[in-house]
Amino acid sequence: MGDEDETPFSAADSLRLIEEQRSTTQRSLTPDPRLLYWPWGIAWLVGFGLLFLRFGPNGRVFVDMPVWLPLSTLYFLMIVAFVVSGVAGARASRHMSGVSSLTGALYGWSWFLGFAGFIALAVRLSPHLSDEWNGLLWAAGSIGVVGLMYLNGGAIWRSRDLFVLGLWITAVNILGVIVGPGWHSLIISLGAGAAMIISGTFAHLKPGRWF
């Protein structure tokens, strides 16, 4: 009688241990979404926000600040974001093997090659553009690469949420290009930057839906 009473408890304990092990394995294979999204969100929110305040539509200056400050801040924060998200992804990929490891590595190289290709094009075109359109080229082009890579990531890992994020970033970027220099910075700051922060928070609260 005593053994029969203990059996359900043993089964429940086994299920609990299995679930804990599954959760631990999932956490080890999945990078912290906050480290993947928040750094980029902060970089865009702050960096493009400063660009809008200093280089507004039609050359308007909303806040007088040194010319070098907005771009320097944006580039610095984007470098930090690239390093932080790259390290987070690399740590997670160490536990992968086979096809999953190869997919992650190829996806990482796609980021590098995508930006390299865009930079090569932008460097060639920049001397032929005015300052405001040159700024739009670099801003819209870099955001375009990011949006495309998130779309690809959503397709590769069959993540609807990740694909929707890429779609949103792409749509916001297109809208910014249509309205033109100055306004593009504001739209990216609030639309894309805030979206990245919200997405990182959502992915952290709802693990397992993004990767």
For each of these PLM feature ranges, what is it?
Residues 52-65, 123-135, 179-183:
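Helix-coil boundary and interhelical linker segments in multi-pass alpha-helical membrane proteins
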Residues 146-211:
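Terminal transmembrane helical module of multi-pass membrane proteins
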Residues 1-33:
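N-terminal juxtamembrane cytosolic/stromal segments of multi-pass membrane proteins
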Residues 23-27, 86-98, 163, 203-211:
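Juxtamembrane membrane-water interface segments of multi-pass membrane proteins
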Residues 99, 103, 107-162:
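Membrane-proximal helix-loop-helix units in multi-pass membrane proteins
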Residues 34-37, 41, 75, 112, ...:
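Residues within membrane-spanning alpha-helices of integral membrane proteins
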Residues 30-120:
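Selected alpha-helical membrane-embedding segments in polytopic membrane proteins
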Residues 44-51, 78-85, 115-119, 143-150, ...:
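Helical transmembrane-bundle signal
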